[in-house]
UniProtKB/Swiss-Prot annotation:
One of its GO terms (biological process) is carbohydrate metabolic process. This is Transaldolase. Its EC number is 2.2.1.2. The keyword Transferase applies. PROSITE patterns: TRANSALDOLASE_1.
């Protein structure tokens, strides 16, 4: 019997795990997910690293070594995160080889405090890429206005990029433009375009979480009927943008030079509302050439009881437009929602990063006292 995760893979969906820790690497649980549940990549973010590093004792030895070496807290966090990502890259190397680098990818994010600093982001992206030193790493850069320039510049250096925290269709268009500009510059710089890979991480469940609150406040039957629909509608229309902008003459010239399209990646795919089906943002977002990065709980639910019925994206464009129009008619501002979500998303990552630095600083101090 074919498992639901295999069915997703057969439908053109690449399954990535939205989590990474040293424990997963050392105990073999990540390898098991590759072997049994069709996982072909990993994404990380500041919140994931904060949870990994501050729970358990997996990082105590490294922190003690860094303390003895006199490393700063930033140097220690950099060493820990890049080591885990490099080890994960090695684990996924056979997948990368089998897919010519399309999958087998491991993402690591630039310091989120640099989200509004173009030059700082470019420098950090290069630093991370050099330190990890693996062909299958993706450097995550947030899709802020300042980040767009950094995305282009990083790709122009031949570095593969995961563009993160995309919420709006307008910003997604700008992301694809930044990607194609980066490839055009990379070509001019003499890079092999077939070796430059990118995904655009479009966040899904957070859109519903915010819009559902506003629908509840309105409270009418018409409003309640729209709950749980905005996130899917937004993502489906993003795929329509993807189809449009990778069918242009501009893209055809890049493709002739060996370029591969920047794939849409569905992020934030765990349901926030427990009344919704736990596989909602997986089985309802099936389309050729997409990535779906899932927390393990969502992955397990999909493997256990996900119902895959083929492409559930391209046949839903009319309904998706109708959903967004209905929200607008109720006075819910799409632009207001997506701007708020970008701001909140960045704030959450910055807060997690600062908490991580504070916790590691305390651990370094304790290690120095113990020695």
């Amino acid at each position: 019997m074919t498992t639901p995760t295999q069915q997703l893979s057969d439908a053109g969906v690449s399954i990535w795990l939205d989590d990474l820790s040293r424990g997963r690497l050392q105990t073999g649980t990540l390898r098991k997910l590759i072997e049994e549940k069709n996982v072909v990549g990993v994404t990380t973010n500041p919140s994931i690293f904060h949870a990994a590093i501050t729970s358990g004792t997996d990082y105590d030895a490294t922190i003690a070594e860094q303390a003895a070496a006199g490393s700063t807290v930033e140097e220690t966090v950099f060493e820990i995160t890049t080591t885990d990502v490099a080890d994960a890259c090695d684990l996924f190397a056979p997948v990368a080889a089998a897919t010519r680098g399309v999958d087998g990818r491991v993402s690591i994010e630039v310091d989120p405090r640099l989200a509004w600093d173009t030059a700082g982001t470019i420098a950090e992206a290069k630093h991370l890429y050099k330190k990890v030193n693996k062909d299958n790493v993706l450097i995550k850069i947030p899709a802020t206005l300042e980040g767009l320039e950094a995305i282009t510049a990083t790709l122009a250096e031949g570095i593969s990029v995961n563009v993160t925290l995309i919420f709006s269709l307008e910003r997604y268009r700008a992301v694809i433009n930044a990607f194609q500009s980066g490839l055009e510059q990379a070509k001019g710089n003499g890079h092999d375009l077939s070796k430059i890979h990118s995904v655009a991480s479009f966040f899904v469940s957070r859109v519903d979480a915010e819009i559902d609150k506003r629908l509840d406040a309105i409270g009418t039957d018409e409003a309640k009927a729209l709950k749980g629909k905005a996130g899917l509608a937004n993502a489906r229309l993003a795929y329509q943008v993807y189809e449009e902008l990778f069918s242009t003459e501009r893209w055809a010239l890049l493709a002739e030079a060996g370029a591969l399209p920047q794939r849409p990646l569905w992020a934030s795919t765990g349901v926030k509302d427990p009344s919704y089906p736990d596989t909602l943002y997986v089985t309802e977002l099936v389309a050729p050439g997409v990535v779906n990065t899932m927390p393990e709980k969502t992955l397990d639910a999909t493997f256990d009881h996900g119902v895959v019925t083929g492409d559930t994206v391209t046949r839903g464009y009319d309904d998706a437009n109708a959903t967004l129009n209905a929200l607008d008619a109720l006075g819910i501002s799409y632009n207001d929602v997506v701007a708020l979500l970008e701001s909140e998303g960045l704030d959450k990552f910055v807060a997690s990063w600062k908490e991580l630095l504070g916790d590691v600083e305390g651990a370094l101090a304790s290690a120095r006292k113990a020695s």
